[in-house]
From Swiss-Prot:
Top-level taxon in the UniProt lineage: Eukaryota
InterPro entries to which the protein is assigned, alphabetical: BRINP (IPR033237), MACPF (IPR020864)
Lineage: Eukaryota, Metazoa, Chordata, Craniata, Vertebrata
Name of the protein this chain belongs to: BMP/retinoic acid-inducible neural-specific protein 2
SMART domains, sorted: MACPF (SM00457)
Keyword annotations: Cell cycle, Glycoprotein, Growth arrest, Secreted, Signal
Signal peptide: 1-33
Organism the protein comes from: Rattus norvegicus
Positions glycosylated per UniProt: 185, 354, 473, 579, 626, 658
Amino acid sequence: MRWPCSSRFRGLWPEAAPWAVLLALGVPGWVLAVSATVAAVVPEQHVSSAGQAPLDWLLTDRGPFHRAQEYADFMERYRQGFTTRYRIYREFARWKVNNLALERKDFFSLPLPLAPEFVRNIRLLGRRPNLQQVTENLIKKYGTHFLLSATLGGEESLTIFVDKRKLSRKSETLGGVPVVGGTGNSSAVSLETLHQLAASYFIDRESTLRRLHHIQIATGAIKVTETRTGPLGCSNYDNLDSVSSVLVQSPENKVQLLGLQVLLPEHLRERFVAAALSYITCSSEGELVCRENDCWCKCSPTFPECNCPDADIQAMEDSLLQIQDSWATHNRQFEESEEFQTLLKRLPSDRFLNSTAISQYWTMDANLQHRYQQLGASLKVLLKKMHRIVRRLFNLCKRCHRQPRFRLPKERSLSFWWNRIQSLLYCGESTFPGTFLEQSHSCTCPYDQSSCQGPIPCALGEGPACAHCASDNTTRCGSCNPGYVLAQGLCRPEVAESLENFLGLETDLQDLELKYLLQKRDSRIEVHSIFISNDMRLGSWFDPSWRKRMLLTLKSNKYKPGLVHVMLALSLQICLTKNSTLEPVMAIYVNPFGGSHSESWFMPVNEGSFPDWERTNVDAAAQCQNWTITLGNRWKTFFETVHVYLRSRIKSLDDSSNETIYYEPLEMTDPSKNLGYMKINTLQVFGYSLPFDPDAIRDLILQLDYPYTQGSQDSALLQLIELRDRVNQLSPPGKVRLDLFSCLLRHRLKLANNEVGRIQSSLRAFNSKLPNPVEYETGKLCS
């Protein structure tokens, strides 16, 4: 006799088997129950119908549930398309079966009437049997449990299998057409109708079945099955609704089993429990071991893979492969959907669409957004199911020699779909479209396709992108943005023309060459200038104490206004009388392009990285030295006038620290107390002169107000910006560059202040429109 799976077990550990085998107890003259053995379960393979979700997680060998008739009926209906089941049932019980042998032992304290063969097998085990002996002599012959009590009864049920797709189509077709039953009542064919009919089955059975059969014939969307079961002659159902009926749902009316170890001697009980658990859990292929909340089978040498259920693992791996196929199918259906194809047709073809432009069209399409959300919901369900299977798969493979083989699909991001649209637009000239690469504006074609790239329109945008595509050929630019010029269908940065006609700024004089020429005092790098001073004359001795500060001026351009000069070095030859304690101190002011003395900048000698004076002896007898400060190519600057303020200080030796100290001399009224005399032989500026055409620059400025074409105005602005930057680049060192360009306009072109301001504003406005504009702050030098 086989008992239902809802039976209750007592006596074994919680890891006991989900079903049990009943023990035969012999009583003199009669048999209480017959023994049963475990039947080998044959796995049933099911294949789900096309277009429906697989049920492989149910199809492996998991016990008697898969051999039940109810499960077989469900799978059969599922293959036919009925995805939903409604079932209403009631159970009844009338006969209670108890183990009389146990009652006899409990009430009368009599020994159990065990079968002689069972007792003989116990004695054959001895005092310390191994698990294999217990399994062979007891478990395989008598099972693991025996019957304690049970309730016998039956069941009456009504099962309705529903195909929701057919039901919804029939409802839309019929609309409000009534479904007439035997009683004349009418209602729409819907799930609510089925709910009401199922609920009224036990109240009015005949009428309910008649109406359900009518719906089944009319729609074909449901299958109705009526089941009545009951053991031991329970074929009379007339009084099922009477008060004497007992429902099996009550807790006391379940099958109760007791572990067989309670019948064994004390020394065999623990070994029997271990053998029973190993037999049930490990299928006699190993020994069950439990440690630290984890149990596994210690495999015997004959079955080294007893912990590795290959059939279950293979079934789960197959399920993961099917989910991957479903994942790819969902993505393909989204790409082939009406919403996606509609977006492709709406995209403009007269210009190139980058990812940002496609994302804007994507965001504005509400229907596509809704369809994309549906795709995400479907993939989320698949991913959740896949994670669940993967967790179970890793648990099963925890003690396997091989690791599971699977690949988790990744959800495609929005950027993937935007690139997919680009690929369909620009790489679809073959059977299978290639992959578009936005960085290189090219296509990567499939290996079996020689070419898949179609015409790619020009890209519109700022900077080097096109302002408009050509009307006759959309792959080429028709016009460009400010700061760029059209060349062979492409926009290239517009470069200012050469400034040689206005101001020659190029030189190839290197620092080593300059240093060599300065040592030789080469006249080829000397800038001719006029020496002016009211305090002294060149080549004459003078008393430095006569004035506290003397002004020496070198002025160029007095007779050559068509040149501007660049200073690379400044040199003075200073002579002192013998035993003189005076030391010359010079402050240098440079005026770049003329104007008042206040429009000069101070030279920061020996401050930061700025060079210091270099002194070389010329005449030891007269104590003459060349004082030279070399600016080089790094610190070179424009000059028109150089002002040298000469002071003197007294050099002395500190006896305490053995260091040289300087202090200012006092004004001497007595000539006999003179501290020495000084003589300046030469004052020279070394550098080079640049050709300068003020009239050409004025003509260039006139094009800002009276352009011949827009291109000529842009070209003039570019040249003026280039000239401004090149001039200001020779600004003296400091935190902020000085605005030498305004000084050039003000003093060499003789422009008014408001005219200079207007030109600077025009240059700043045009420069802001150029690609990668470079703006820098400048300090005011000229008023």
